């Protein structure tokens, strides 16, 4: 179980990422002002929700925050949610998302994504210059659908199909 920081912001920095504790054992991970991911730490396992655009090494953040085994899940196929997948050996996603995620796992797609973001006021251009192409790599994908459950020990997160933003969108429901 992670420590709940009692300062007024519950914020810490790890390898350039800013983490804010949003509730006990739930952390929002800001990727250089570009994207937010979530880490939920259970008593037996942890779950990283999305991997960001992949500028920094999100794996090092997860492994600094917990020594528990963990799973990684993408909520949909958009690049700002799957760009760090190459940091991990296996990632879960809705079965409809897998072909798109695999197709965009290349340097050209990454560069096109960065260029498409440059006009956004929150885009951190300096961070994109730090991009490490070595994180574009092979990783196994496991398809999931509604009803799949991530068991973390003291909490279960159930997959709900939530198409809309994309046809392969999912949400995770913690019934506790």
Where are these regions (language model features)?
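Metallo-beta-lactamase
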Residues: 45-48, 53-54, 133-135, 141-142, ...
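Conserved beta-strand hairpin/beta-sheet module of binuclear metal-dependent hydrolase folds
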Residues: 13-64, 171-176
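Active-site HxH/HxHxD metal-binding segment of metal-dependent hydrolases
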Residues: 55-152
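Short, basic/low-complexity N-terminal boundary segments at the transition from targeting/disordered tails
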Residues: 1-19, 122-129
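Residues at the C-termini of beta-strands that transition into short coil/loop
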Residues: 23, 30-32, 76, 95, ...
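Short, hydrophobic/aromatic-rich segments at coil-to-beta transitions
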Residues: 22-28, 147, 156-158
């Amino acid at each position: 179980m992670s420590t709940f920081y009692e300062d007024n912001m519950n914020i810490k920095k790890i390898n350039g990422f800013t983490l804010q504790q949003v509730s006990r054992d739930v952390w929002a991970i800001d990727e250089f002002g570009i994207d937010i991911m979530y880490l939920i730490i259970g008593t037996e396992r942890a779950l990283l929700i999305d991997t960001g655009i992949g500028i920094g090494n999100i794996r090092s953040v997860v492994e600094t925050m917990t020594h528990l085994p963990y799973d990684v899940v993408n909520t949909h196929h958009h690049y700002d949610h799957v760009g760090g997948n190459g940091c991990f050996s296996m990632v879960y996603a809705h079965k409809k998302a897998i072909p798109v995620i695999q197709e965009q796992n290349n340097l050209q797609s990454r560069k096109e994504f960065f260029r498409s973001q440059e006009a956004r006021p929150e885009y951190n251009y300096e961070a994109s210059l730090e991009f490490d192409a070595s994180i574009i790599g092979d990783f196994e994908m496991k398809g999931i659908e509604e009803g799949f459950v991530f068991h973390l020990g003291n909490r279960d997160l159930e997959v709900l199909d939530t198409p809309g933003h994309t046809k392969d969108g999912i949400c995770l429901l913690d019934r506790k």
